[in-house]
From Swiss-Prot:
Biological role stated in the UniProt entry: Involved in the assembly of C/D box small nucleolar ribonucleoprotein (snoRNP) particles. Recruits the SWI/SNF complex to the core promoter of rRNA genes and enhances pre-rRNA transcription. Mediates interaction of TELO2 with the R2TP complex which is necessary for the stability of MTOR and SMG1. Positively regulates the assembly and activity of the mTORC1 complex.
One GO CC term, this protein: nucleus
Swiss-Prot/TrEMBL GO biological process terms: axonemal dynein complex assembly; box C/D snoRNP assembly; rRNA processing
PANTHER family hit by this protein: PIH1 DOMAIN-CONTAINING PROTEIN 1 (PTHR22997:SF0)
One matching Pfam family: PIH1_CS
Name under which the protein is recorded: PIH1 domain-containing protein 1
Keywords per UniProt: Nucleus, Transcription, Transcription regulation
Cellular localisation: Nucleus
InterPro entries named among the record's database cross-references: PIH1/Kintoun_subfamily, PIH1_N, PIH1D1/2/3_CS-like
Family assignment from sequence similarity: Belongs to the PIH1 family.
Entry superkingdom: Eukaryota
Amino acid sequence: MDTDASLLLGVEHEQKQQEELYQQLLLQTMGKLQSDSPPSKVIRPQPGLCVKTSSVSDKKKVFLNICQSQTVPPPPHLSQEALVELLESEDPTSYRVPMSLGEPHTEVDNSSQGCTVYDVVINDEFFQKCEKDTLFQQFLIAVSLEGLENKYSLELSRDIKILKNRKFMGSIAEQNIRTKSKPIIQEIDSKESLTLPSAAKRPEFTLLVEPPSGKAEHLIAEILLPGVSSARSLVLDLGEDRLVLIARPSLFHLDIFFPVLIDQENSVAQYNTNTQTLTVTMPVVSL
């Protein structure tokens, strides 16, 4: 039986239009989030405490300068009882502590040996709370280590030491931070911040570098979203080194840092409804 080519072309055209619509809606969401990006300012954080640890791979010394600033927004209120309950839950990362993670810098320790130092900046009131409560202090150090590991693809030892006689190692660099948090990440009440990620699953994903060898030109994220029938339910936010994805209603939640800086404005997202895979192609910024 002969097949009407015009019918096939019509179906293909309709599918192509639908895919383009999905992509346009997703990119409109990305563009709105980027255009709504709050202003940023350069701050010089105040000293707080200094934590000594080491890199698991080469055993070299690493120091964390946990600093404080009133410019960084505080996390939602959390009592000690709620913190204990949170730490015993399946997903302690559901409670977010806003923080600015600085670039690594090389310093010289008391033994005249070179070491790597990271500056972590948190809200000053929350820092004072952690300073008075050992459990909160341990929690703060844990989330700081995890944040650095995610952002810089590190593995840091949990065998730590808080230095008693110094509040920072080397010098504390200025940092460029947002003056107001993005709604998708920070402006949620304490109840939502504790329930959203536990209800939403972390999707499976892969990160690919193109080309596979040589200088990286593109970073490609492929995120599997089974059960998501349309891009309309996706909220995607790209930062210079971060990807945040929410699939409504509370289906998936992904928040990852990249080991490289990306060009948000020229990034492209496509959602394939057949494979239920979101592909985000991001140009790598040359340093």
